[in-house]
Amino acid sequence: MKMNDLIHIRRAFHQIPELGFNEFKTQKLLLDTISNMEQTRLQIKTWKTAVFVRVEGRQDYTIAYRADMDGLPITEETGYSFASKHEGAMHACGHDFHMTIALGLLDHFASHEPECHLLFIFQPAEEGPGGAKPIIEADVLGAWQPDEIYALHIDPNLPVGSIATKPGLLFANTSELFIDFQGKGGHAAYPHTANDMVVACAHFVTQVQTVVARNIDPLDSAVVTLGVIAGGTKQNVIAATARLEGTIRTLSMASMEVVKSRLEAIAAGIEASFACKIAIDYGSNYCEVYNDPELAEAFAAFSKTRKGITFVEAEEAMTGEDFGYFLKQYPGVMFWLGVDSPYGLHDSRLQPSEEAIGIAIEHMVAFLSAKKPR
């Protein structure tokens, strides 16, 4: 597949971002593109909006490569001529890149027999509610169980030509956070007859600021971010309800449990103080991304030998990724791919360099071609 074809495919994906488990147009574009490849050694199956392609290799050992598919509920502001056609949705996390790179790899190995069997996993719903865990729990792969698994994620902060990863912990444990307050509304002139949830909510927000500072080991890392606060309907009406939305991120599961326990204790105290009811919903939870140390070291060593590739020793990040569920099931590696964008992930102006697509494909073709069973 030529670079012009890859760029065309990436831009086609970019125009049709779809949210989790609704990637119907995306799935069709994937299947249409795959149908034009050499079919001799391919086996294809689907599950919901996911696509799985097995490539027959010479040795009875299977290496999986995963690419996520979904977009984000963000209104695009890139100014691209190929900007999103779906109002309020955008590929702002590079999943259009991820799929295009996977297709480039698949196209190569469809016509060049790989050393090992390859399994390409095009996974929906990474941004939520999560697609990796349901695929594993439903045993969708069946007999196509991989012995190793790999994936990449674009990094706007790294220059094109850079690849970064590390053995062990790479990304954090994450949890969504939705908190609903229920009190009693009333007239602003008669606060004694009401139960103000804006005030209760404000006290909760203030107390949450002590959770990490006074409950998490300073040598560990955790963050609680409350990104949405909503309450009230009119300036002279006391709010009967309020809502907070946020996220929890920790580098250890033990710290995640501590944070959740403290949030629930604070909620119980606010309930007693303000005679209200508080409901906490943790939404989607993603486990940490933990790279197999031996495989990560081998991938790093290979990357350092490649002309045109600058290998960077990555640091642990508070990023969340449901690829961690695959890594709990199968040994593997996730790595960062430099795309040199002036704007970051989840930014409405994200503009990754398309030059990185060809670099990633060339690198992973070489890696997978040289890969031997462990």
Swiss-Prot record:
Entry's Gene Ontology molecular function annotations: N-acetyldiaminopimelate deacetylase activity
Active site location: 68, 127 (proton acceptor)
InterPro entries in the cross-refs: AcetylDAP_deacetylase (IPR023905), Amidohydrolase (IPR017439), Bact_exopeptidase_dim_dom (IPR036264), Peptidase_M20 (IPR002933), Peptidase_M20_dimer (IPR011650)
Enzyme class: hydrolase
Pathway the protein takes part in: Amino-acid biosynthesis; L-lysine biosynthesis via DAP pathway; LL-2,6-diaminopimelate from (S)-tetrahydrodipicolinate (acetylase route): step 3/3
Keyword tags: Amino-acid biosynthesis, Diaminopimelate biosynthesis, Hydrolase, Lysine biosynthesis
Catalytic reaction annotation: N-acetyl-(2S,6S)-2,6-diaminopimelate + H2O = (2S,6S)-2,6-diaminopimelate + acetate
Gene Ontology biological process terms from the UniProt entry: diaminopimelate biosynthetic process; lysine biosynthetic process via diaminopimelate
EC number: 3.5.1.47
Pfam families: M20_dimer (PF07687), Peptidase_M20 (PF01546)
Family as reported in the entry's similarity comment: Belongs to the peptidase M20A family. N-acetyldiaminopimelate deacetylase subfamily.
PANTHER family: N-ACETYLDIAMINOPIMELATE DEACETYLASE, PEPTIDASE M20 FAMILY MEMBER
Entry function: Catalyzes the conversion of N-acetyl-diaminopimelate to diaminopimelate and acetate.
HAMAP family assigned: DapEL
The protein's name in its UniProt record: N-acetyldiaminopimelate deacetylase
Organism: Shouchella clausii (strain KSM-K16)
